[in-house]
């Protein structure tokens, strides 16, 4: 790694995950955004061998370090990830969406994964859904990826899939009690927006509401330092929101998902998605450094808005 560090000057990496599981459940199995437990443990071995694990307070300081984060507040954060991090004495941040806490409702992407899972089980379901969507059965998957939550609910009724019952049975998200336990154990609890909506589709007022609502919950849970991670990344987000976050919104640091990148806002940091199951952490991180080096030659390694 020494060559990459010397060439780029980028000493800190920010790997992130959604969940860790050897038995992916239907609400995320079709999304491919998960890491097996073995891969995750191998990742941690790589990171701890080459970098120092640091707290959120040290994110942005250029030293050979890494900070882990996990998005969407999924239940495996408590049942799988939490014990591993405690055993290895590693710091991390959990970014949550308050709409899903205590399994009150389901994230649209998880609804779509469930629908896609059901498609595999029944040709009758495929026919019903293709009729509803007015598309060929072979095009159902691409159509489903474009629907909103209300459409997903309507389609679920067609094939007798009950999202509310699934939430009760499987409890896919963290509970308030679990979040407070994580916080009391020394982990950072961060803001991932109220409902995981894509911020580049929202008005400025809607964006602020998504952030402020979660900030209020975090303060009730005793969280003093506020950090925000954009759902779906920060593509096409206007400078106006960044200025508001830092000056009025109480956000100390914010995060995107663009990999190893520089940013025009020094308090905004980019993370590296680790959920590429066929690749090791070393392969993923080296590829990020190589891509950064290529972009720097073209003067495109810094995000400008």
Please name every model-derived segment.
Residues 69, 73-81:
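Membrane-embedded segments
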Residues 104-185:
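Extended, charge-rich helix/loop segments that form flexible
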Residues 88-90, 185-189, 247-253:
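Glycine-enriched alpha-helix->loop->beta-strand junction motifs that scaffold or abut catalytic
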Residues 2-7, 82-87, 173-184:
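Short amphipathic alpha-helices and their capping/turn segments at secondary-structure boundaries
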């Amino acid at each position: 790694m020494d060559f990459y560090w010397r060439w780029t000057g980028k000493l800190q990496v920010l790997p992130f995950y959604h969940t860790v599981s050897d038995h992916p459940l239907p609400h995320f199995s079709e999304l491919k955004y998960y890491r097996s437990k073995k891969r995750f443990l191998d990742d941690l071995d790589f990171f701890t061998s080459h970098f120092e694990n640091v707290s959120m307070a040290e994110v942005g300081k250029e030293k050979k370090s890494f900070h882990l984060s996990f998005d969407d507040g999924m239940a495996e954060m408590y049942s799988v990830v939490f014990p591993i991090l405690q055993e290895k004495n590693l710091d991390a941040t959990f970014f949550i969406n308050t709409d899903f806490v205590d399994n009150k409702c389901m994230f649209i992407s998880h609804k779509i994964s469930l629908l896609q899972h059901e498609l595999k089980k029944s040709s009758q379901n495929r026919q019903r859904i293709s009729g509803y969507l007015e598309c060929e059965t072979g095009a159902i998957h691409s159509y489903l990826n474009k629907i909103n939550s209300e459409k997903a609910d309507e389609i679920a009724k067609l094939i007798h899939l009950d999202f509310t019952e699934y939430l009760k049975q499987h409890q896919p998200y963290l509970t308030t009690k679990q979040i407070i336990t994580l916080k009391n154990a020394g982990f950072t609890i961060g803001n991932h927006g109220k409902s995981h909506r894509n911020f580049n589709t929202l008005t400025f007022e809607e964006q602020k509401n998504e952030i402020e609502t979660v900030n209020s919950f975090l303060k009730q849970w005793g969280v003093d330092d506020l950090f925000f991670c954009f759902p779906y990344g920060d593509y096409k987000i206007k400078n106006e929101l960044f200025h508001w976050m830092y000056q009025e919104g109480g956000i100390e640091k914010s995060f995107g998902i663009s990999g190893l990148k520089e940013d025009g806002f020094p308090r905004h940091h980019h993370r590296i998605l680790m959920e590429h199951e066929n690749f090791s952490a070393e392969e993923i991180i080296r590829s990020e450094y190589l891509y950064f080096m290529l972009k720097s030659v073209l003067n495109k390694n810094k995000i400008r808005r």
